A protein has these predicted regions:
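Amphipathic alpha-helical assembly/interaction segments
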Residues: 1-158
Length: 158
């Protein structure tokens, strides 16, 4: 397969690794933090997926803009999933995920993304949406932290 020297090909890596960030606007809201980390990885994947697309192509700018808005929407969950603002944020996240899935599929139709990459990003978006849904159904998801010791059976008491 001949490569065009003007097209940058993303380096193949096992995972999308992002630098560790110590700033945590989520406090004790573990689920929102996990959702945000997922959204960060999706945004990074979108940037990699669109790296070789011309800057003048609206699909590139739209996909990247949507990933920024998704990050903003997930950041809105920091005050909680069940509060009135959390409900609005969840609705926005679901709408944004659906729009991003459509945009990623258009990238595939336009020949900018392989079927495999399109499928992976689509699944990651769907899983983010499902995670937000499941996290919104219980307060345990936001505030409860289990340690390894909490889950181990005390052998002395058995």
């Amino acid at each position: 397969m001949q490569k065009d020297s003007n097209i940058k090909d993303a380096e193949r890596t096992g995972t999308i690794s992002l630098p560790v960030v110590r700033a945590n606007p989520f406090g004790e809201n573990i689920s929102a933090e996990k959702a945000y980390r997922r959204a960060e990885r999706i945004a990074a994947a979108i940037y990699i997926l669109t790296r070789h697309v011309s800057d003048s192509d609206t699909l590139k700018s739209r996909a990247r803009e949507s990933s920024h808005i998704l990050l903003h929407d997930v950041l809105g969950l920091r005050s909680g999933f069940r509060m009135e603002s959390g409900s609005d944020a969840i609705s926005s996240i679901h709408a944004r995920v659906r729009e991003m899935i459509s945009t990623v599929q258009l990238l595939s139709v336009a020949g900018y993304s392989s079927k495999e990459n399109t499928g992976m990003v689509t699944r990651a978006l769907e899983e983010l949406s499902q995670f937000v849904d499941s996290a919104s159904t219980t307060t345990l998801s936001e505030r409860t932290v289990f340690t390894r010791e909490d889950l181990l059976i005390d052998q002395a008491s058995v």
